[in-house]
A protein has these predicted regions:
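Sec-dependent signal peptide recognition
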Residues: 2-9
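C-terminal motif of bacterial Sec signal peptides marking the signal peptidase cleavage site
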Residues: 15-18
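Beta-rich interaction/scaffold domains
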Residues: 20-135, 140-144, 169-172, 187
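Short, exposed beta-strand/loop patches in secreted or surface proteins that constitute
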Residues: 43-50, 72, 88, 139-140, ...
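Extended Gly/Ser/Thr-rich low-complexity repeat segments
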Residues: 64-76, 164, 285, 331, ...
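Extracellular beta-strand-rich solenoid/capping regions of secreted or surface-exposed proteins
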Residues: 70, 153-165
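Concave beta-strand-loop units of leucine-rich repeat
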Residues: 121-127, 144-158, 171-187, 193-218, ...
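Short, low-complexity, Pro/Ser/Thr/Gly-rich segments in the mature regions of secreted, periplasmic
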Residues: 681-697
């Protein structure tokens, strides 16, 4: 029993000792955390952000934490090394070690971030004093526009903005007003990003022409536009700029140097305009790959070469006023133009013997990769451009215009190109005044293309297409022209010199009008397969060759479309006759239309025929009109059953009107549509009603 009591007493002592030992171990004995850090200097306190094992204090870049004091809160039972109380330089990165009561270490890295000073909203600096005052704030980021100067007539001049060197970013636009009279933009050199730069406008060029150099040496990003309209600007230089999300426009009559060595992409237009003057001879954009909208370089009188060695795609090209001494255009990788491509030289228009275009550009070989032009490709006014072999790789084109290429003699081969204009525009081929050009090679089917060839100086441009939407061909040459054409889905015009002729024996139909213009002594009119002319057939000129070869052996209808098109409408100024659906002039006799059955529209108008025969003609929807036919005595139209009018003037041998008896009796011809004057016999409408078809014997 005594032993048992002793044992119980022993256990009680041990238990009491254990309880005393637990009371000496803190509850946070396993914790080793820094929970809060603040740093104070010059009356300002900055709270740190603690994330994971990093303590970050952010202060303005103008604030030094050397000599600052700090408050560091951490686990109460833990120990910290080094002791924050012993530190005075809080600008320096360092490591703090927190050791828990139980001996577990936790390291924290202390960092200082020097942040930019931001200014919200727009900043306007209209005077030198405002420049100095703003610079003193240390602001480095403006979250709006920066406006320097004023356009007011009495504004105080600002000559120096170098105090603004602390600026690094302008989220809005930098706008330079007229009262800034400095020669450079020194003071903006440290800016790396801007919303845009604006000096003058397209409507009002900047008046401060003392500004000669536009340069921001550290600028690498522009989220909007660079617009410089200032005729004093000579030098433009952005050494680090890689991308412009908007436009890049430089308009100056003094431009001497333009350097953009790192520029790759332009999200808007790229426009360099010399105001008809300029000093620069070469423009090189060594790294530009894309220009989303228009690429335009114009009115630089001294320009001799343009080079875009890496350009692949652009919205359009507008080089529409290149100097007459411009020598070289290099775009070897350019493949896609999503719009028009205008390559046009200035053209000096003097008298007949002194007109001239460009005299230096001989080829466009360094554009041979071009595959797509969705708009019009226009190449004009190049006297010495001898070849356009670069067009061979075209796969898609909207339209093609070649004009005043005086010495271009090589064939124009676009045989792989499909014509497909953007936005439902009409595709056209226009060739004019290309003196030595002899051949155009395309796909056979140009049913969606209107072709206009105006040959020049007794020249004829041969072509291979068989189907076309519209065809207009003009040449002063005097020969017989053989055309391969089979289908014209719109209007057809052909004009040639005296004594010439046309052979188009594969032509089956013309949906629009057919206008043939040969002044006189036509040798051939051969259209042996032609069955239909949907609009007017207007023969301008006089058929006066007795041995003319003619063939309209299958032509059955003329001007019978529901809404026929006309080459000539209204009335002739002589004798007031209507322009007919079939309108033709001759001084001799031809049986031109042996199977013609119907003429619609305004009917038939003939001039000067000695006889006129249409043995199969059944219908004339309008009137039968004739004038100046001194030998015409009758019409050979035995099957004619429909006629709504007669208009005869000066048919001095015509006296027998019995052919019209039926049409008068059936009231197909009414009194207002019966016009006869100057003929051998001039019956009135009532005479015809009374059966007086011939003069009384």
């Amino acid at each position: 029993m005594k032993l048992k009591q002793i044992f119980i007493a022993f256990l009680s002592v041990i238990a009491l000792y254990s309880c005393s030992e637990k009371e000496d171990i803190p509850a946070d004995a396993d914790d080793n955390f820094i929970t809060k850090v603040t740093v104070s200097v010059a009356g300002e306190t900055y709270s740190a952000v603690i994330a994971s094992d990093t303590i970050t204090v952010t202060v303005p870049y103008t604030v030094s934490l050397n000599g600052a004091s700090a408050t560091v809160e951490f686990t109460p039972s833990a120990k910290i090394m080094p002791d924050p109380a012993t530190i005075t330089d809080w600008d320096t990165e360092r490591t703090f070690r927190i050791t828990s009561f139980n001996g577990q270490a936790h390291d924290y890295t202390y960092l200082v971030i020097k942040d930019e000073i931001r200014s919200k909203g727009n900043v306007e600096l209209k005077t030198p004093a405002e420049i100095v005052s703003f610079a003193a704030t240390g602001t480095s980021i403006i979250k709006g526009d920066l406006v320097i100067g004023s356009d007011s007539d009495d504004a105080e001049k600002i000559k120096d903005i170098s105090a603004l060197g602390m600026l690094k970013e302008i989220e809005g636009n930098i706008i330079i007003r007229n009262s800034y009279t400095g020669g450079t933009l020194t003071g903006l050199d440290n800016i790396t990003k801007i919303g845009g730069l604006s000096i003058g406008s397209e409507e009002n060029s900047a008046a401060n022409e003392t500004l000669e150099m536009v340069s921001m040496t550290k600028l690498n990003e522009v989220t909007g536009n660079i617009h410089v309209y200032n005729n004093g600007v000579k030098f433009v230089q952005f050494d680090l700029l890689k991308a412009i999300e908007g436009d890049f426009v430089i308009s100056s009559s003094s431009i001497t140097t333009l350097q953009m060595p790192e520029l790759i992409n332009v999200g808007g237009v790229l426009n360099i305009f010399g105001m008809g003057k300029g000093v620069i001879s070469t423009l090189v954009f060594p790294k530009v790959q894309t220009v989303k909208n228009s690429l335009s370089i114009n009115e630089i009188s001294t320009l001799k070469s343009i080079s875009f060695p890496e350009l692949i795609e652009t919205g359009s090209i507008n080089f529409s006023s290149l100097p007459i001494e411009f020598e070289k255009l290099s775009m070897p990788k350019l493949s896609v133009i999503n719009g028009d491509c205008l390559i046009i030289s200035n053209y000096i228009q003097g008298d007949l013997f002194s007109t001239t275009g460009n005299v230096s550009l001989t080829n466009l070989d360094e554009m041979s990769n071009l595959a797509t032009v969705t708009g019009i490709l226009s190449i004009c006014n190049f006297n010495e451009l001898s070849s356009l072999s670069n067009l061979k790789n075209l796969k898609r084109i909207g339209s093609l215009k070649l004009e005043k290429l005086i010495n271009c003699s090589s064939p124009i081969d676009i045989s792989d190109a499909v014509f497909s204009a953007k936005d439902s525009e009409e595709s056209i081929i226009r060739i004019s005044e290309c003196k030595k050009l002899q051949k155009l090679i395309t796909k056979d089917d140009l049913s969606n293309v209107s072709v206009d060839i105006d040959a020049w100086a007794n020249n004829y441009v041969d072509f291979n297409f068989k189907k076309v939407k519209k065809l207009s061909y003009t040449t002063p040459d005097k020969k017989v022209f053989t055309l391969p054409i089979e289908e014209v889905h719109g209007d057809f015009y052909f004009g040639a010199g005296m004594k010439s002729g046309i052979i188009a024996n594969n032509l089956k139909f013309v949906d629009g009008y057919m206008h043939l213009k040969i002044s006189m002594m036509v040798s051939n009119l051969e259209f042996s397969k032609l069955e239909k002319i949907g609009g007017q057939f207007f023969m301008e000129g006089t058929l006066n060759t007795p041995k003319m070869v003619h063939n309209f052996s299958n032509l059955k209808s003329i001007c019978c479309n529901s809404n026929p098109s006309y080459a000539k409408e209204g009335k002739w100024s002589t004798n007031n006759l209507p322009y007919g659906g079939l309108d033709i002039r001759s001084t001799t006799t031809y049986e031109l239309f042996p199977v013609l059955e119907k003429v619609g529209g305004t009917g038939i108008t003939i001039h000067g025929f000695s006889a006129f025969s249409c043995p199969e003609l059944v219908t004339i929807a309008g009137s039968l009109s004739a004038d100046a036919a001194s030998k015409l005595t009758s019409f050979d139209m035995p099957k004619l059953k429909s006629l709504s009018g007669v208009n005869f003037v000066k048919l001095t041998s015509f006296s027998d009107f019995s052919i019209f008896e039926t049409f008068i009796r059936d009231n197909q011809i009414t009194e207002p549509n019966w016009i006869v004057s100057g003929c051998k016999y001039n019956p009135t409408y009532q005479d015809m009603k009374d059966g007086k078809y011939k003069p009384a014997e």
